[in-house]
């Protein structure tokens, strides 16, 4: 208002009428003419970048993973600063809930393998321990069952299969994908799972023997003995699957496969592997081995 009427009234008179100080008015005008301060400009720039990375993660990433994205782009910033930016913008990441053990149907007549892992899923090398499990996926057309196989070192999903029935063929299909991806295995690989009848079956025992896999299972009703596989389900359900409604089984199958390969394996940063994606982590391991 003062700016609009300064040709008619003196600045002093208008400040008196509006009950504002002249020093305050001149301070405001200098700030407007000089533009935002370097601090405010830097904050606005950071907020924009944080918002872009948050959106790119489908609203999943919080401060730790966005910090990794920023630093990968050359930004020198702290986790505390990133967290403050998220708060200013009303943004938040999604943290997986504590996982709950999935229902396991055991076979009382099966010969149960020993636990060869002892919760040490990551031995520091690829193709030493594979973990596997089965989970339920709800759709409007009924249930689907997803079996996944992950490398214990890189956390990469190397095999997966989805079907309407939870039988041994489902597990075998996921393992067949893993074997095809990894190629001929020079050493025996431990395949660790729970005591579900699919994993203790004679059918799977034959498949494992034919493909240089040695079976290992955890204790009954102790979900921590297969914690790495269970943590994958928590990420899948909380960060992706449970955020949407699935009208058809076909749509769910396509979307889950896309999320596993495009997001989880190639984009999602994992705190356990230096905030890298599983594929990038495997690439680094390969480069390190070749340089040695």
Where are these regions (language model features)?
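Charged DNA-binding/catalytic regions of mobile-element recombinases
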Residues: 1-292
């Amino acid at each position: 208002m003062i700016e609009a009427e300064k040709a008619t009234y003196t600045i002093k008179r208008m400040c008196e009428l509006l009950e504002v100080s002249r020093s305050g008015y001149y301070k405001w005008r200098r700030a407007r003419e000089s533009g935002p301060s370097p601090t405010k400009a830097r904050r606005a720039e950071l907020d924009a970048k944080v918002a872009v990375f948050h959106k790119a993660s489908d609203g999943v990433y919080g401060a730790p993973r966005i910090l990794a994205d920023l630093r990968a782009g050359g930004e020198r910033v702290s986790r505390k600063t990133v967290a403050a930016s998220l708060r200013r913008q009303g943004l938040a990441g999604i943290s997986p809930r504590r996982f709950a053990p999935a229902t396991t149907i055991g076979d009382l007549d099966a010969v149960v393998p020993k636990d060869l892992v002892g919760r040490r899923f990551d031995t520091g090398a690829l193709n030493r321990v594979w973990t596997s499990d089965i989970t339920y996926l709800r759709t409007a057309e009924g249930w689907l069952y997803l079996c996944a196989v992950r490398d214990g070192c890189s956390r990469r999903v190397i095999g997966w299969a989805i079907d309407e029935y939870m039988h041994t063929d489902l597990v075998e299909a996921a393992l067949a994908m893993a074997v095809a991806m990894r190629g001929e295995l020079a050493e025996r690989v431990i395949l660790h799972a729970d005591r579900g009848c699919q994993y203790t079956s004679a059918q799977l025992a034959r498949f494992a023997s034919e493909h240089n896999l040695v079976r290992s299972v955890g204790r009954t009703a102790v979900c921590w003995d297969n914690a790495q596989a269970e943590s994958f389900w928590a990420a899948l359900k909380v960060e992706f699957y449970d955020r949407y409604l699935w009208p058809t089984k076909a749509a769910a199958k396509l979307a889950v496969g896309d999320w596993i390969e495009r997001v989880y394996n190639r984009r999602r940063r994992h705190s356990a592997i230096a905030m890298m994606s599983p594929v990038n982590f495997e690439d680094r391991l390969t480069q390190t081995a070749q340089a040695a």
